[in-house]
Amino acid sequence: GSSGGRGFTGQTEGKAETMNLKQAKELVRGRLSDKRYEHTLNVRKMAVKLAKRYGVDEDKAALAALLHDSAKEISKDEMRAIMRAHPELAEGGEERPTPVWHGICAAILARTEWGVEDEAVLSAIACHTAGKPGMSRLDKIVYLADMSSKERDWPGVNKLRKLELKDLDLAMLAALRQTNDFVLSQGKPLDPMSKAAYDEIKAEVDARAAKAG
C-alpha cells in the first residue's frame, strides 16, 4: 500500500497540487488522536503568534505547524520504510535517534504525497524535534511553538513563553537546553543536530553580546 498517504487526495496528473491550510487540517484530523490533534491546533496558534511577532509568513508557519506531527502515529517500521523509499530526503534519519524520525517522515510525505513544495515549510516540519544548525526564523518558530503550545505544562514553560516573544535566539537556547537535559536525564542518545544547533546559536548570541558590550 502507500506509505501513510491516506487522507489528502489532491492528485492531478500524478502530481499532488499544493495543499492549503484547510486541507492540511482535514488531513491531520484523520491521522491523529484527539489529544494530538488538539496539540497540533495549539501549536498552529502559537506559531502564527510568533510569526506575527517576527515578521515571518503566517501561512507558512500555520502549514508547518499543522503538519509537524502528521507522521507521529505511524509505526517505526512504516517510518523506516518512508525514509528508505526516499533516502535523498531522509537526512540520514535512520542513523539518528528515533524521536526525530516522525518529523523527517512528515516532511517526506508532505513533499512526495501531499504536494507541499515550499522548502522553508518542509524544513520547519523536518527539524521541529531536535533543531539543526542554520535554522531559519520559521524553523525556530515551529520548534518553539511545539514546546510552548497551550497545553504544555512542564516546569519553566511560562518562562519560555515570555522569552520567545522577546528574543527568538535566547528562547531557542533555553528550549534546546531544556530538551537536551531531558533526553540525557532519560539516558537516551542526544541527536547530534541538537548539539550543533545549540552550539551555533550560543556562539551567535555570545558574539552579539560581545558586540553590544
Kindly label every feature range from the protein language model:
Residues S33, K52, A130, D181-K188:
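Generic secondary-structure signature for well-ordered alpha-helical cores
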